Amino acid sequence: MSDISPQDQARILSEALPHMQQYDEETIVIKYGGHAMGEEHLAREFARDIVLLEQTAINPVVVHGGGPQIATMLGRLGIKSEFAAGLRITDASAIEIVEMVLAGSINKQIVSHINAAGGKAVGLSGKDGNMVTAVKATRTMIDPDSNIEKVIDLGFVGEPDKVDLALLNQLIGHELIPVLAPLAVSTDGQTYNVNADTFAGAVAGALRAKRLLLLTDVAGVLDKSKKLIPELSIKDARRLIADGTISGGMIPKVETCIYALEAGVEGVVILDGKTPHAVLLELFTNQGTGTLIYK
């Protein structure tokens, strides 16, 4: 804010007050990923913004991805990355690397950034305290040669089955900031890699969060002329999926939004994590940013 006059700084803070009051003591789940996580200056800005939320009596819960970092590490080790239905096929050798990168390197880096900014973050995965239990994910696709539907074996890729809030509520109650890697465990102890958007949606739904923010590399949901759609109801979102306006990788993100809303989240926003202070712009300004999806 160095280029802003003191008077404008005061006005901005004053205008943010009703928004801060709206979110007082509420839980906000933020899915953090994409290029915003890979660029150091954006990563540090994000950490400061998370600390600011906590300092204004908001309970932030961070869920992070790590696809590019996983791909880089697998490549270094000579393990080929394969995808099906938008999900990384994760075999026995890959799941160890995925866990190392997500729960080790990335998670602890985010925790360090938040703590350096004055927060008290705790890094965990869904395995800790059996927080998130998962079942094996299944997908089908049509074989182009035979035109027969086939089941795809995704390996150790899971979908959330149950979220136990005991540990999360303890952390939030002690004013700690949970930073969660999207790993889960099955009832027989098997580790599963879970899509970060899906993981965040499950956690937000279980917490009945005030907001779920999905930080991406795009401005939000776009119409057919590539213009941002500021707001969508669930009904509108389903219609845009059906007519092809929402397509490709945006479909599972919007489906996660719908799931979270139906599970009790008040509002979900898809926004561009590359925008400086995107989280603050969404929560503390009248205009907001990205696409708000609501019931």
UniProtKB/Swiss-Prot annotation:
The record marks K31, K253 as: Transition state stabilizer. It catalyses: N-acetyl-L-glutamate + ATP = N-acetyl-L-glutamyl 5-phosphate + ADP. Its main location: cytoplasm. It is an enzyme of class 2 (transferase). GO terms for molecular function: acetylglutamate kinase activity; ATP binding. One of its GO terms (cellular component) is cytoplasm. One of its GO terms (biological process) is arginine biosynthetic process via ornithine. Its EC number is 2.7.2.8. Catalyzes the ATP-dependent phosphorylation of N-acetyl-L-glutamate. This is Acetylglutamate kinase. The lineage of its organism: Bacteria, Pseudomonadati, Pseudomonadota, Alphaproteobacteria, Hyphomicrobiales. The gene is argB.
